[in-house]
Amino acid sequence: MSDAVTIRTRKVISNPLLARKQFVVDVLHPNRANVSKDELREKLAEVYKAEKDAVSVFGFRTQFGGGKSVGFGLVYNSVAEAKKFEPTYRLVRYGLAEKVEKASRQQRKQKKNRDKKIFGTGKRLAKKVARRNAD
């Protein structure tokens, strides 16, 4: 894994509204399958003098034949800004947020349909009975 990897950034735009720099990342990786996003985040953090957690990379496509990948990168001014503006699924990937576990689709539908069966005054009474039974 000691093969040289070259990272170039182009189309660098400073986005003050979202407190970040955004750019296209070109990665040259000859004699190597690909470069991990984690490794790219580390190297970009060095280049832009930012924390690794404030750097986000995504959308990488490897050219046919390998050796070159192109993707998109974001460097936020701070980790707090990254947590504020980045989508939750990316924060989960980077270990900055917990994944929200929700009931399965089938369970949600079954609950919705159960709730539809009781309505009006009966619904009020059903809630009252459920509360009384819970105590």
Swiss-Prot record:
InterPro entries: eRP_eS24_sf, Ribosomal_eS24, Ribosomal_eS24_CS, Ribosomal_uL23/eL15/eS24_sf
Phosphoserine sites (modified residues): 14, 56
Compartments, record wording: Cytoplasm
Descriptive protein name: Small ribosomal subunit protein eS24A
Gene Ontology MF terms in the entry: structural constituent of ribosome
Region feature Disordered, mapped onto this chain: 102-135
Cross-link Glycyl lysine isopeptide (Lys-Gly) (interchain with G-Cter in ubiquitin) placement: 21
Entry-annotated residues carrying N-acetylserine: 2
Originating organism: Saccharomyces cerevisiae (strain ATCC 204508 / S288c) (Baker's yeast)
Self-association and partners: Component of the small ribosomal subunit (SSU). Mature yeast ribosomes consist of a small (40S) and a large (60S) subunit. The 40S small subunit contains 1 molecule of ribosomal RNA (18S rRNA) and 33 different proteins (encoded by 57 genes). The large 60S subunit contains 3 rRNA molecules (25S, 5.8S and 5S rRNA) and 46 different proteins (encoded by 81 genes).
Any Pfam family: Ribosomal_S24e
Family, similarity comment: Belongs to the eukaryotic ribosomal protein eS24 family.
Misc remark: There are 2 genes for eS24 in yeast.
Keyword Hydrolase: no
UniProt keyword annotations, A-Z: Acetylation, Cytoplasm, Isopeptide bond, Phosphoprotein, Ribonucleoprotein, Ribosomal protein, Ubl conjugation
Compositionally biased residues, Basic residues: 105-115, 124-135
